[in-house]
Amino acid sequence: MKLKDMPPVEDIDSYTRCFGCGKDNPMGLQLKPHKEGDEARCEFIAKEHHQGWPGIVHGGVINTMLDEVMAYAALYQGLHCATARMEVRFREGAPVGHKLHISARVAEVRVKTVEVEGKLVDDDGTLLAESKATMYILKDVKKR
């Protein structure tokens, strides 16, 4: 399906099958992003089945967490987006079983795209990963 043909998600809370945030997706992460100031934020405790190397959260799971919270940062600005490009820099291993904090903010809004930045830190504030994404604006949605 082409991005321009994607159906709108007018009420994101009614979409419950998303791998990142869907509460009715038993295989997903079931993230619960919330708005705090001009950022989207979320906490997550990775379980053993989220690991790559023993005791370390798999990089794909970290990508998914950052991607999801960055999309919510755009959504909280009233923009329904899909990720066009994303870059992640891993700084430290994210430990399984510990609370992780994901945050993201919109850095720039353009005509067709949004630039978003995200980061993952542990409880001590140690930077574990940081990301930048270009997201394609599908359509404006109701502000949350």
Predicted regions and their residues:
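Hydrophobic beta-strand-centered segment that forms part of the acyl-chain substrate-binding groove
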Residues: 69-101, 106, 132
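Non-catalytic linker/capping segments at the edges of enzyme domains
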Residues: 1-43, 47-48
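Active-site helix/loop of acyl-thioester processing domains in fatty-acid/polyketide metabolism
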Residues: 34-39, 57-81
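HotDog/MaoC-like acyl-thioester-processing domains
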Residues: 1-11, 94-96, 106-144
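Hydrophobic residues in beta-strands and at strand termini
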Residues: 44-46, 90, 137
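Short histidine-centered catalytic/ligand-binding loop motif
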Residues: 46-60
